[in-house]
């Protein structure tokens, strides 16, 4: 595997079989997709928030991780769909994928934001309730304006997903981490619909959440509005399972308070879910880069390449120091080539006795290939 920059002007290496492409929305990536497609390369990827993670740092532009004949085999399926059709589209995508690759070692998913859970449900059903471990992220742009795109072949999809299966003669590893700690505040969802959280413990959700945050949302609660700058360090966590003494959480990012007292979220929640106020720090967002690489690489041999997915909301916090994410990830995988995207949602597998693929926010996931 090797990382290749569209801006370098260098010729494509010989024997490229597949290309993972990450790009900022202002980069001229469509000619790159056409060039790769003309060479018979399987192409997949997404647009990324403010930059792309490459071994040299966090840079704007279009970049590709190229796989050759000695690397894992990749097969991809795309679907243009919306929320209503996403579940059935995912089932049909799996059926198409399995015709040429009955049981991938790992799945990579890139979707446009808004209906990731429906896609995961369809994938689960398509694999008869036992899908391979899945990792990936939700396409992003620079300002939540909807310019995000999923990359599939020579196409940039504004609503849909691309599902990639990898098979390899060598082990493939993955991990999915939160990097936030549970606090003492918690409550149970008593009214919710999809990504709208209306009530916690019988009270308006925005009122309860603001109380947990110490009143920082008081003015916005009166008018309604975007609260991302107030909530990135305090997402809502839902326990997935326990491994030994450790409870593992999937995170939900509240992004808006409504005048009716509800919270708009970037994931689904359900009535009966217990929510925990999670606590993060800027340094912890860097530390979890080490965690995601170390957990994926635990017991692994030499790494030949990797894929990193890191939440765009966290990039808003790490700011000018975001290149440290690339530096630390690269060091952990002993400077093997890798490519990463800053996304508006993350998908990953909680491995263990009962593996489960989930969609979350403010998280990080990785795939490492031996």
Locate predicted features.
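Small-residue-enriched flexible segments
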Residues: 1-42, 46-319, 323-336, 341-370
């Amino acid at each position: 595997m090797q990382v290749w920059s569209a801006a370098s002007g260098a010729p494509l290496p010989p024997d490229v079989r597949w290309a993972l492409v990450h790009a900022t929305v202002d980069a001229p990536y469509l000619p790159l997709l056409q060039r790769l497609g003309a060479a018979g390369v399987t192409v997949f990827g997404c647009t990324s928030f403010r930059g792309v993670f490459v071994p040299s740092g966090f840079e704007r532009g279009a970049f590709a991780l190229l796989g050759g004949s000695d690397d894992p085999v990749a097969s991809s399926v795309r679907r243009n769909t919306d929320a209503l059709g996403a579940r059935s589209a995912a089932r049909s995508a799996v059926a198409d994928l399995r015709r040429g690759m009955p049981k991938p070692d790992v799945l990579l998913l890139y979707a446009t934001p808004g209906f990731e859970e429906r896609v995961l449900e369809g994938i689960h059903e398509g694999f008869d309730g036992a899908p391979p471990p899945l990792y990936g992220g939700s396409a992003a742009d620079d300002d939540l304006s909807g310019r995000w795109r999923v990359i599939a072949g020579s196409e940039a999809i504004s609503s849909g997903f691309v599902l990639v299966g990898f098979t390899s003669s060598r082990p493939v590893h993955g991990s999915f981490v939160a990097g936030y700690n549970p606090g003492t505040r918690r409550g149970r969802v008593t009214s919710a619909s999809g990504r709208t959280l209306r009530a916690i413990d019988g009270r308006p959700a925005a009122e309860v959440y603001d109380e947990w945050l110490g009143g920082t949302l008081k003015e916005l609660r009166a008018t309604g509005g975007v609260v991302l700058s107030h909530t990135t360090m305090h997402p809502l966590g839902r326990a997935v399972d326990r491994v030994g003494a450790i409870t593992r959480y999937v995170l939900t990012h509240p992004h808006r308070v409504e005048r009716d007292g509800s919270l708009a979220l970037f994931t689904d929640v359900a009535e009966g879910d217990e929510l925990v106020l999670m606590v993060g720090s800027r340094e912890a967002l860097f530390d979890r880069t080490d965690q995601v690489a170390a957990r994926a690489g635990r017991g692994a041999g030499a790494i030949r390449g990797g894929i990193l997915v890191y939440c765009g909301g966290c990039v808003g916090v790490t700011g000018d120091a975001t290149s440290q994410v690339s530096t630390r990830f690269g060091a952990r995988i002993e400077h093997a080539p890798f490519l990463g995207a800053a996304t508006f949602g993350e998908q990953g597998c909680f491995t263990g006795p009962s593996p489960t693929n989930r969609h979350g926010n403010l998280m990080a996931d990785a795939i490492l290939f031996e």
